Amino acid sequence: KLTSKPISAVASEILTPEQMEMYQVYRQTMGNKPLLFGGGSPDMSNSEDLTGVQFVNGTRPGNPQLVELAKRQVGNVGGYPYWSWYGFDSRVEWCACFVSWCYNQAGKSEPRFAGCEWQGVPWFQSHGQWGARGYNNLAPGDAIFFDWDLDGTADHVGIVIGTDGSRVYTVEGNSGDACKIKSYDLNYQSIKGYGLMNW
């Protein structure tokens, strides 16, 4: 005889607590992969050269060692070991896993997030560490969140290298499925905001 059970009942019976936590995130986002993991960046351009850039960062202390660690990842394609370190068995949209991995390597156990909108942004906001687009006291190592399609939802995240006063320079994982150095006008409309790290 066949019986029918809702998937939530089956999930609670067979999933480990860690798997159940990931399942709850999946349910919150209605299984929408871009909402769950962020869509990464479709940008297939090359990494930018920082030669000649004069950084004029704000007054908050940053973490230059973290930035150097992130820059050493430039050229990685496919996101391994970042998504694997996070606990995924295979490749996912990995921009947030990259940022979390870098923070962990720098000695920070938090924030740790695999999704931009449903994990990363709320963590920074709930800890009083959020700056909206236009925030002008950036520090090396802050997180930068993007809303590519301007629907109010964070789609991508990277690490701030610094600013020259008119542009923000970043290291991003999953930018065209690779780690790259990028830059954006500080007023670029697709910048959703910044996760402000306390070092």
Give the label of every model feature segment.
Residues 1-42:
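Charge-rich (acidic/polar
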Residues 2, 6, 10, 21, ...:
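Extracytoplasmic/secreted proteins, especially bacterial periplasmic and envelope-associated proteins
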Residues 41-108:
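N-terminal capping segments
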Residues 42-54, 131-133, 150, 154-199:
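Aromatic- and glycine-rich peptidoglycan recognition patches
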Residues 78-140, 151:
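Catalytic cysteine-centered active-site loop
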